[in-house]
Design a protein with these regions (language model features):
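Acidic-enriched and Gly/Ser
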Residues: 1-123, 139, 143, 149-177
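Short coil-to-beta-strand transition motifs
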Residues: 126-135
Length: 177
């Protein structure tokens, strides 16, 4: 089941906002009924406190077409637009699905998101569990436990999210994603 639609008159793309105005741009597009997605991730601050932060600061996924360009030009908080061709945005939709799954998984655990320069050729693909279909690599953490780091490539920037070995091998049915 896909959470993001592929439109016939719009294509999904990425928008870079100025400063930290992605929340404003999200509400601006929502007001004009332009589909957009602003991913959040849960971050544990202390033992009893956690907050939801924007996963990719200054970036926002938006589906726009020719009819929406005039509306976008009126928003002064947009610095760049990166759009794919209409009906050729499967790669972006696939990335958004992975990001959505990670966003849902962050509600049950604290998974650090870091920028990296990982080598994409050495990645393995998981075939079962809650991270099924995601690509990454195994590493040994400082406390001696194995972690699986999921690698995401968003506009040429590589991100890694670390998951514990026990989480990777959990049954898929136990986690509703």
């Amino acid at each position: 089941m896909s959470h993001f639609l592929q439109y016939t008159d719009r294509a999904w793309g990425l928008i870079r906002t100025t400063g930290k105005s992605e929340q404003y741009v999200h509400s601006y597009f929502t007001g004009y009924n332009i589909p957009c997605y602003l991913p959040h991730i849960r971050k544990v601050i202390s033992k009893y406190k956690s907050v939801r932060r924007i996963m990719f600061p200054c970036y926002l996924f938006v589906a726009w077409g020719d009819q929406d360009v005039a509306i976008m030009k009126n928003c002064y908080h947009i610095s760049h637009r990166i759009q794919s061709e209409v009906n050729a945005d499967n790669n972006i939709i696939e990335q958004m699905e992975d990001i959505y799954r990670i966003e849902q998984l962050s509600e049950i655990g604290d998974f650090p998101l870091t920028k990296t320069d990982s080598n994409q050729s050495k990645l393995i693909k998981l075939h079962s569990g809650p991270l099924k279909g995601m690509r990454g690599h195994w590493v040994n953490s400082t406390n001696g436990q194995s972690q699986f780091k999921v690698c995401l490539n968003i506009v040429g920037t590589h991100y890694e999210i670390a998951f514990n070995k026990e989480f990777v091998y959990q049954k898929s049915e136990a986690i509703a994603v």
